Amino acid sequence: MVVDTEYYDLLGVSTTASSIEIKKAYRKKSIQEHPDKNPNDPTATERFQAISEAYQVLGDDDLRAKYDKYGRKEAIPQGGFEDAAEQFSVIFGGDAFASYIGELMLLKNLQKTEELNAEDEAEKEKENVETMEESPADGKTNGTTNAVDAALGNTNEKDDKNKARTTSGNLTVHDGNKKNEQVGAEAKKKKTKLEQFEEEQEVEKQKRVDQLSKTLIERLSILTESVYDDACKDSFKKKFEEEANLLKMESFGLDILHTIGDVYYEKAEIFLASQNLFGMGGIFHSMKAKGGVFMDTLRTVSAAIDAQNTMKELEKMKEASTNNEPLFDKDGNEQIKPTTEELAQQEQLLMGKVLSAAWHGSKYEITSTLRGVCKKVLEDDSVSKKTLIRRAEAMKLLGEVFKKTFRTKVEQEEAQIFEELVAEATKKKRHT
């Protein structure tokens, strides 16, 4: 018997609703009541917070049990309720895929790489300046003096002195070159900050692959360690179809699911094909996969260049709109300055292309990580060949489930609205 139904009523679900139904209801209600979607409603923020609190309680099994038995006063999270906007971003910001793909580091690492590269360049420049300052300038001074003497016709009068100076200068230059060579050798031994960071990231990536491999083996073991009949396979498919139906509504969830499914299916198919025809069966699939990697790389670079070009175009438009002087094209015709609406449209276009570039970069990273994970799972020499074949078959089955997942028209519309809100929330968070 539930003593208080207020939270259930806020989410519009029954007291017997499953955790999946509760999460879906929260997603739908939070979109409807989000303050950004109700700018002229002063009570929207309050309703949004109430919906968030309801989900924070009903979305936690222990808190939900306390709420059902004792009411809301006995069902307060240990650290208090989180801010609704923060909760909204955390729940639907991509963390749900962490056990499949780990934390996406590419975009973060790009920024860090640029910073470290700039630091290394500055340090290198500083070392060059210090080396120049430490090297004696006798040779240069003598060279200059000799040139001046020659111009003035004084070479005969100072011939002996010039020889001495030249000899001295040559010794100094030789010593300086020797010192520069030593500095250069030391510089090669000394790793730059960027190189150190790249090595650290490689270690972290391997740790991530190891952990994700263990998690994937556990998932596949639901089938591989079973009786392994048709009933078990159907049960396995149903379990992950339910999970996929929840994950598909995450931010870019459907794209991520399809990416995971493609890699699982592809790697499993290559492995299974390699077990036939003396291992020759997997060559075609492997070549096809390499072609896919090339195309993914090409799309990633193209999307980044496209976003960069759009950004440059927007900068030109902004400069033109703020310039008080009349503007002319290369033929001498006066150009019309862009309006506020045109600038807004270009900004919207840029946002879309930046998101596209970010997604292609993320997809490239996801694919790279998952290929490493699948390789480790299917090349595990601690288990029998029979187990590896079962793993590949289960992986292929899971890949099929994820590849076939789709959104209904209504779900797609809701997801698009939701993804816009997440992007806006992330943008606001960066500026606070």
From Swiss-Prot:
The keyword Chaperone applies. One of its GO terms (cellular component) is cytosol. Gene3D superfamilies: DnaJ domain. Residues 117-187 are annotated as: Disordered. GO terms for biological process: protein import into peroxisome matrix; protein insertion into mitochondrial outer membrane; protein targeting to mitochondrion. It is found in: Cytoplasm. One of its GO terms (molecular function) is protein-folding chaperone binding. Its main location: cytoplasm. It holds the Pfam family DnaJ-X. Keywords: Chaperone, Cytoplasm. Residues 4-73 form the J domain. The keyword Cytoplasm applies. InterPro entries: DnaJ_domain, DnaJ_domain_CS, DnaJ_X, J_dom_sf, Peroxisomal_DnaJ. SUPFAM superfamilies: Chaperone J-domain (SSF46565). It comes from the Eukaryota. Interacts with SLN1. Required for peroxisomal protein import which maintains the function of peroxisomes. Belongs to the DnaJ family. Present with 8970 molecules/cell in log phase SD medium. This is DnaJ-like protein 1.
